[in-house]
Amino acid sequence: MGREVEAMPFLVRGMYFSGTGTTEKIVTAVAEVIARAEENFFRNPDIDFTPPAARKKPYRFGPQDVVVFGVPVIAGRVPNVLLPFLDTLEGNGAIAVPIVLYGNRNFDDALIELRNILQERGFHTVAAAAFIGEHSFSKVLAAGRPDEADIDVAADFAKAAAAKINAYVVDAAGEDQPLDEALEKILTEAGPVPVDGEQPLRPYYKPQDRQGNHINILKVKPKLDETKCTGCGICVQVCPMGSIKWDRPYVKVDGICIKCCGCEKKCPEGAFYFDDPGYLYHKEELELGYPERKEPKLFV
């Protein structure tokens, strides 16, 4: 009789940057379904690297890790403020499922950029996706997304990704392979997953007015209506750049703003607002120009 071989275990976790919670929603949905798909898949705690402190820690993985890795799209690319952190990741042969979430305009080169970063950091990307979420600037553009239909798509995507991952650890007859053979198969055969996007990467998307003039909103920051602020401190906690600080009895925006709008959308009193004319013009142009529902794009 041949020796009994146990299936190679996989440790599944989500890892995400999510200013308003939309990327988190998709990443966790995918990770949950992958973890339930096979008996040898096990759910591990997620890593939320939205808080600045979380991006100061080292993250090291190995060949038995499956990381569903999600970031939002900013200006058609991976947010440039995340690049130094992403360059510290150590995949060490881990499997990754890169996911980007965009606000109904276009994900441009964000997905291929994220895939390339993960590959360069030692991950094997075997499946990838671009999902849609409510635009950070707006409550109209892709309002309420990801919605129930998106979560259903995420579940189907996760099942397909799980089947692909598990195929690396079984032989042609569907029998579990010895651990060393399974690891070798992952290292030699897994990824990179083909995705949409251009190489070399295109420049960051720049908003324009209808005459083609560039609208610069890089230094735009939200303002605080002190008559509405109750000093609850939620904004201090949710700002991913650590740029909202106490200025008792209120708060002040004192640092880089990436316009994730977590402060504006999560403030229970609606105390944050934007009044920059260029920003408001660009927001309206997005709402008028991209009203049609877009659907997720999946790559397995």
Q: Where do the PLM segments sit?
A:
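FMN-binding flavodoxin-like domain, especially the glycine-rich phosphate-binding loop
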Residues: 3-14, 18-26, 30-47, 57-219, ...
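Conserved SAM/SAH-binding loop
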Residues: 51-54
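Iron-sulfur cluster-binding cysteine motifs and their immediate structural context
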Residues: 224-226, 230-258, 262-280
